[in-house]
Amino acid sequence: MALEFKDKWLEQFYEDDKRHRLIPSSIENALFRKLEILDAAQAESDLRIPPGNRFEHLEGNLKGWCSIRVNKQYRLIFQWVDGVALNTYLDPHKY
């Protein structure tokens, strides 16, 4: 697995198909697909496809972290190290 989680509940959602109150039912399918993409990625370039991922390197307080979009509000944030997404967590991005 090229994916390590910060939160146990997100890991259980992905590996055991276990629902959690912090994951809105409206994003469950998209979130699972994005986690599959993240898990299968071997290089940063794999995360740029599809363009809807909106892969980016973050700045400021999150310098050294990356993100892909689940939808307009939610992001998966992680540290990309040697082809592995570390400390992956779901962020309800506030605009």
UniProtKB/Swiss-Prot annotation:
KW Cytoplasm (keyword) present: no
Task: Tell me the leader sequence span.
Answer: none
Keyword list (alphabetical) reads: Toxin-antitoxin system
User: Is Nuclease set as a keyword in this record?
Assistant: no
InterPro entries cross-referenced by the UniProt entry: HigB-1, RelE/ParE_toxin_dom_sf
* Induction text: Induced by amino acid starvation. Induced by the protein synthesis inhibitors chloramphenicol, kanamycin and to a lesser extent by spectinomycin.
Q: What else is known?
A: HigB-1/HigA-1 has been shown to stabilize plasmids very efficiently in E.coli. Three hours of ectopic expression of higB-1 results in bacteriostasis without any detectable loss of viability.
**Function, please?**
Toxic component of a type II toxin-antitoxin (TA) system. Inhibits translation by cleavage of mRNA.
User: What is the name of this protein?
Assistant: Toxin HigB-1
Please report the organism this UniProt entry assigns to the protein. Vibrio cholerae serotype O1 (strain ATCC 39315 / El Tor Inaba N16961)
